[in-house]
């Protein structure tokens, strides 16, 4: 039952439908007594009813009833930086992968690989507390702030861990993330990663909260330094070299070109965004500081920066897409989030904040959701999804401005809360009537089709009508 609820939470409706169908009424009642959310039971029976209402086309597979077994679902195998990966889902370099036991559990759970927490020869001393969250009403946090830096382990210990991981999990991709303070340190750490058996090395040019200047995002903001350090590491090792980019810049074009000209095999993007929160929970002995912001809230920013590389005519002219692969990072929580990065050209995705919230177990729904989506579309290879939406990203000047789409209200789903009315009155075009029957009505002569009402509706009662020419 818990697995069914989790599948629904992470938008894997195929698995949720299958598992809820297997539950008896007695099991549902027992589950509702046992499952408590804050101070009240989870309404599992109601959740099950809603899930089973979902209408979907039969999955393309060999079964007569249209239902795929795990073995019949499409493979998620994909080539990334000349590494064959069993799926595109990797752990991002962070607190979720700081020792052997953690990474081993993740790999056994189904993750295809890991970008291990950044290794350095420097003395790392972390602060306490070092995490904070941005919340929205009753939701889990949508934004996450952290003040962590790099691995606190002795660097020799970390490379021993990576060696053990590769020995014990030879089919998984083990990637060392490193940060040096000098040219010599960058080269030494990269060589140690190669000697440990790592499949690739990531260069951390992007940590936004380093105690010392001239490290992390200070490098990532300077294309000359990116070119300098990447070139030296590229010449020192034979394994793929993957610089990790900072979002704390105006454009990704120059940093990406620097990586390309230095001979990088790929790029990881993005790291966290510089931020400040003012809550008491973020204080360290009464003081606050600038640090990294991540989570669901940063996904649109991450996607924009991915597009600045994969959809950039300057980079295309240089031939960058033929020589460098992109690993997408930033706000990935469900398989749909991952799909968006893949459709913009990523061949690999990394997850951190969602794992910190929900655990390594989310990999089940990341993989199953993406596989079922591919099966429904009849897609047999993940690489066919890579970059397929790039053609639909255009300049603002190229958008259709002569037609509009009215919102469409389903009164059977409307609960009469008035949220749409308030938002339209105070933030829109006063195009909704809200009478004594507490049922909203669209005023066509005033509506401009902005769809603010649809976005604030708590029940999904407002949909989309057909696109029509704008009224004159």
Predicted regions and their residues:
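Iron-sulfur cluster-binding cysteine motifs and their immediate structural context
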Residues: 1-10, 29-51, 341, 419-437, ...
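Ferredoxin-like iron-sulfur electron-transfer modules
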Residues: 14-37, 397-416, 430-449, 462-472
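Short, basic, low-complexity termini and linkers enriched in Ser/Thr/Gly/Pro
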Residues: 45-71, 318, 469-472
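N-terminal capping/small domains of soluble enzymes
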Residues: 70-174, 180-181
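Hydrophobic faces of well-ordered beta-strands that scaffold small-molecule active sites
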Residues: 87-93, 114-117, 174-178, 201-203, ...
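Alpha/beta enzyme core
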Residues: 104-109, 181-327, 335-340, 344-348, ...
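C-terminal helical cap(s) of enzyme catalytic domains, especially alpha/beta-barrels
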Residues: 126-140, 278-291, 343, 354-379
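Extended, intrinsically disordered, low-complexity segments
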Residues: 138-141, 295, 299, 304, ...
């Amino acid at each position: 039952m818990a697995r069914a609820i989790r599948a629904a939470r992470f938008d894997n409706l195929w698995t949720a439908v299958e598992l809820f169908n297997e539950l008896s009424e007695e099991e549902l009642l027992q589950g509702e007594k046992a499952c408590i959310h804050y101070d009240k039971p989870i309404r599992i029976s109601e959740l099950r009813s809603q899930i089973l209402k979902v209408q979907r086309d039969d999955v393309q597979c060999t079964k007569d009833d249209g239902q795929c077994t795990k073995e019949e679902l499409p493979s998620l195998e994909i080539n990334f930086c000349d590494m064959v990966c069993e799926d595109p889902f990797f752990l991002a370099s962070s607190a979720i992968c700081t020792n052997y036991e953690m990474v081993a559990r993740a790999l056994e759970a189904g993750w295809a690989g890991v970008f291990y927490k950044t290794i350095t020869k420097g003395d790392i001393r972390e602060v306490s507390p070092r995490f904070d969250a941005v919340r929205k009403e009753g939701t889990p946090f949508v934004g996450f702030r952290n003040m962590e830096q790099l691995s606190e382990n002795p660097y020799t210990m970390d490379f021993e861990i990576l060696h053990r991981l590769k020995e014990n999990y030879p089919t998984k991709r083990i990637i060392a993330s490193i940060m040096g303070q000098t040219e010599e340190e960058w080269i030494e750490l990269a060589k140690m990663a190669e000697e440990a058996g790592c499949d690739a090395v990531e260069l951390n040019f992007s940590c936004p909260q380093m105690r010392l200047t001239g490290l992390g995002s200070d490098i990532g903001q300077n294309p000359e330094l990116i070119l300098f350090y990447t070139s030296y590491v590229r010449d020192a090792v034979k394994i793929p070299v993957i610089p990790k980019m900072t979002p704390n810049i105006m454009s990704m074009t120059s940093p990406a070109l620097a990586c390309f000209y230095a001979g990088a095999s790929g790029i990881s993007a993005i790291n966290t965004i510089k931020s400040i929160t003012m809550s008491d929970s973020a204080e360290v002995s009464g003081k606050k500081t600038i640090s990294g912001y991540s989570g669901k809230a940063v996904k649109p920013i991450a996607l924009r920066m991915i597009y600045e590389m994969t959809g950039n005519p300057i980079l295309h002219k240089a031939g960058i897409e033929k020589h460098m692969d992109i690993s997408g990072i930033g706000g990935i929580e469900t398989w749909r989030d991952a799909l968006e990065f893949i459709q913009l050209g990523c061949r690999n995705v990394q997850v951190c904040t969602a794992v910190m919230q929900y655990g390594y177990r989310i990999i089940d729904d990341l993989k199953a959701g993406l596989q079922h989506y591919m099966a429904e579309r009849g897609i047999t290879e993940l690489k066919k999804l890579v970059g397929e939406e790039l053609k639909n990203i255009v300049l603002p000047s190229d958008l259709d401005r002569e037609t509009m789409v009215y919102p469409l209200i389903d009164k059977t789903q409307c609960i009469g809360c008035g949220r749409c009315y308030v938002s339209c009155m105070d933030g829109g075009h006063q195009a909704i009537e809200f009478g004594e029957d507490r049922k909203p009505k669209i005023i066509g002569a005033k509506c401009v089709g902005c769809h603010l009402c649809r976005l604030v509706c708590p029940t999904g009662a407002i949909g989309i009508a057909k696109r029509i020419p704008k009224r004159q």
